[in-house]
């Protein structure tokens, strides 16, 4: 499929409706995602989330799970900031996970220890849980994961484990993430979250000014 401008980009990514739509889109896009979108559009979301994680997570962690791993950019950037952290990843697309498997740390070792093909709209089995933290960028957005999926992720966290999750700004408002977070606090499932804002694109990008919210909270298990 030809990829010119955003032909395979924001418009198509935001238009998917089902997990199968996601798998079809990213099967086409995986091999060129980093070059045709991340580099071409100056997309800094994975780097920005990793920087927020490094700033707000004050604990020394050993095991982190990357939710919606994609091509592995979030893990790659986090591994540079936290070189001692063991990273696992989950994504619905085997083709994207294939690209993530190729990502390297600065010492040329693999970024990820294990990669799992998972549909995150359902309960998520994982034999390596619980993790000390979950990180995610670009997954909670139009056509992808809604606020209800947060409940599927919490069982993967250890008690007091960190959740650092980016959410598309418009998606956060239209899908009622604030209400879901309030409900989780009321249930005693999470601590009161801090909501930050970050730029998704670099200055100079045609999309500069687009922002995401970052949910920062801790699990109570």
Language-model features: locations:
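Conserved alpha-helix/loop element of class I SAM-dependent methyltransferases that forms part
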Residues: 42-61
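A short acidic, Gly/Pro-enriched loop at the edge of an enzyme's catalytic core
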Residues: 124-134
């Amino acid at each position: 499929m030809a990829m010119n401008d955003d032909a395979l980009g924001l418009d198509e990514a935001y238009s998917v409706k089902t997990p199968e739509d996601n798998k079809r889109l990213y099967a086409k896009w995986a091999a060129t995602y980093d070059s045709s979108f991340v580099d071409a559009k100056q997309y800094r979301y994975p780097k920005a989330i990793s920087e927020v994680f490094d700033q707000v997570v004050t604990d020394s962690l050993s095991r982190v799970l990357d939710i919606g791993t994609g091509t592995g950019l979030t893990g790659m950037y986090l591994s540079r900031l936290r070189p001692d952290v063991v990273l696992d990843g989950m994504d619905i697309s085997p083709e994207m996970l294939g690209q993530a498997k190729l990502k390297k740390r600065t010492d040329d070792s693999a970024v990820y220890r294990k990669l799992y093909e998972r549909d995150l709209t359902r309960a998520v089995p994982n034999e390596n849980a619980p993790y000390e933290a979950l990180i995610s960028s670009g997954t909670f957005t139009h056509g992808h994961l809604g606020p209800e999926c947060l409940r599927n992720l919490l069982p993967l966290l250890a008690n007091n484990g960190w959740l650092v999750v980016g959410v598309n700004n418009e998606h956060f408002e239209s899908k009622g993430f604030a209400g879901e977070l309030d409900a989780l606090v009321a249930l005693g499932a999470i601590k009161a979250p801090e909501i930050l804002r970050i730029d998704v694109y670099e200055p100079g990008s045609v999309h500069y000014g687009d922002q995401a919210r970052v949910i920062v909270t801790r699990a109570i298990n």
